[in-house]
Amino acid sequence: MKLQFTKMHGAGNDFVVLDGIHQQIDLTPAQWRALASRHFGVGADQILIVEKPSRPDVDFRYRIVNADGSEVEHCGNGARCFVRFVTDKGMTDKRSVRVEVMNGVITLTLQDDGQVTVDMGAPELEPARVPFRAEGLPTRAEGADTLYGLEVNGRTEWISVVSMGNPHAVQVVDDVENFPVLQDGPVVEHHAAFPNRVNAGFMQVQDRHAIRLRVYERGAGETLACGTGACAAVVAGIRRGLLDSPVRVHTHGGDLTIAWDGGAEPVRMTGPATTVFEGSIDLAALPA
């Protein structure tokens, strides 16, 4: 059986996008991993699946599978590619679509200049709902935020915790390019305080409207960009009194613009979505 796919990226965060409405998709965890493999499959940070909605008030359902075969709640860069995909494929003629994700509904809008704005919803800041186990950890206040001290490779690192539909730990660093992201990222991801693991973000504040960001993503490793990570970093920076909305987030894969008015207001992310190529892969070539 041939599986049709489209390869896309959002600021260098790359995806295999599958139309699950017009073809049957039933892959094993090993097949998901092989499809995402850059040596044995197509190669991607994550795999996005377009499906029919399960409720009448949305246009599509959106599923995300990590490169390690685990399914996750949300992906902001993937959401931008999602709306570009369904628009280019003629699956909708709407400029703005409502999409069902694992834990809610998001609104995606295709702008006239080709950029995509995603209404990411309000951030979740209650530690237990991230989820994050704060008991027994040292804390300190900074602005409106509470920072938590984690032991990471023999050092105490102070983090903010934010959920953008998926869990994030955000650390402010002086020089993000030379920070040991590949060494610290896995330690933070698997820290016992995060029962569902966590995406580890490392941001350098350039001015009140600009940051540089690297993210070690849960189940994927460091990626060129992370949309939900950019949102979480900006929320943390605003709450700590370091940033003002809107904020330009510079990643290795490109720039994103994040806006948040605080409190229960939604976070809005704007950035590119690019189609690279289309193809098909023989499922028999993937391990079962």
UniProtKB/Swiss-Prot annotation:
PROSITE patterns the record matches: DAP_EPIMERASE
Domain of life: Bacteria
Coiled-coil blocks: none
Transcription regulation found in the keyword field: no
GO molecular function: diaminopimelate epimerase activity
EC number: 5.1.1.7
Catalysed reactions, as listed in the record: (2S,6S)-2,6-diaminopimelate = meso-2,6-diaminopimelate
Residues spanning the membrane: none
Keywords: Amino-acid biosynthesis, Cytoplasm, Isomerase, Lysine biosynthesis
Primary location class: cytoplasm
Residue positions binding substrate: N13, Q46, N66, G76, N77, N166, N199, E217, R218, G227, T228
Pathway linked to the protein: Amino-acid biosynthesis; L-lysine biosynthesis via DAP pathway; DL-2,6-diaminopimelate from LL-2,6-diaminopimelate: step 1/1
Residues flagged as site, Could be important to modulate the pK values of the two catalytic cysteine residues: H168, E217
Family matches, as InterPro entries: DAP_epimerase_AS, DAP_epimerase_DapF
GO cellular component: cytosol
Catalytic residues in the record: C75 (proton donor), C226 (proton acceptor)
Any one Gene Ontology BP term: lysine biosynthetic process via diaminopimelate
Compartments, record wording: Cytoplasm
Quaternary structure and interacting proteins, as annotated: Homodimer.
Purpose: Catalyzes the stereoinversion of LL-2,6-diaminopimelate (L,L-DAP) to meso-diaminopimelate (meso-DAP), a precursor of L-lysine and an essential component of the bacterial peptidoglycan.
Recorded family membership: Belongs to the diaminopimelate epimerase family.
Name assigned to this protein: Diaminopimelate epimerase
Organism: Cupriavidus necator (strain ATCC 17699 / DSM 428 / KCTC 22496 / NCIMB 10442 / H16 / Stanier 337)
Gene (name only): dapF
